[in-house]
Amino acid sequence: MISSNDFRTGVSIELDGSVWRVVEFLHVKPGKGSAFVRTKLKNVQSGSVVERTFRAGETVPQANLEKRVMQHTYKDGDQFVFMDMESYEEASLSQEQIGTRVKYLKEGMEVNVIQWGEQVLEVELPTSVVLEVTQTDPGVKGDTATGGSKPAIVETGAQVMVPLFISEGERIKVDTRNDSYLGRE
């Protein structure tokens, strides 16, 4: 159980038989009446977002989530299959469940898989990945590191803005949180 006073962004709770993650919270103490906590909750299974108010000190069950390191082994239709490297158990997630993170997911990559009981909820990618540039405009002699940027397509199909001196075939490091170029690899 967790008190509404302990809500923070990212805390997972159980409500109405499903797992919800706190996206935003605000502790409110009006001049008249009792304090309360206004929250914005995201359903981890469906992705829906709701606003809900809790009384200060109200307790709700905290979701018991398990984080396991798994390797992305292959794609079967719109299902992405992951395997636990210790127990060799397989778990699959649909492209909808993975969402926009799919653009950085490649076979053989190790990721954190979040489970609630036996149900797989979501995938956490590493904060940065190394990918090969498959398509970009050619660099021209005289392009410098401070001269600007151009779009590049990487091996997974994602588009990343890169410096002008980057050319096709180079391996670059990309931040998966904000799609930014971090450097050459």
From Swiss-Prot:
Its main location: cytoplasm. GO terms for molecular function: translation elongation factor activity. It is found in: Cytoplasm. CDD domains: S1_EF-P_repeat_1, S1_EF-P_repeat_2. InterPro entries: Elong-fact-P_C, NA-bd_OB-fold, Rib_uL2_dom2, Transl_elong_fac_P/YeiP, Transl_elong_KOW-like, Transl_elong_P/YeiP_cen, Transl_elong_P/YeiP_CS, Transl_elongation_fac_P. Pfam families: EFP, EFP_N, Elong-fact-P_C. It comes from the Bacteria. PROSITE patterns: EFP. GO terms for biological process: peptide biosynthetic process. GO terms for cellular component: cytoplasm. Belongs to the elongation factor P family. Involved in peptide bond synthesis. Stimulates efficient translation and peptide-bond synthesis on native or reconstituted 70S ribosomes in vitro. Probably functions indirectly by altering the affinity of the ribosome for aminoacyl-tRNA, thus increasing their reactivity as acceptors for peptidyl transferase. This is Elongation factor P. It comes from Acaryochloris marina (strain MBIC 11017).
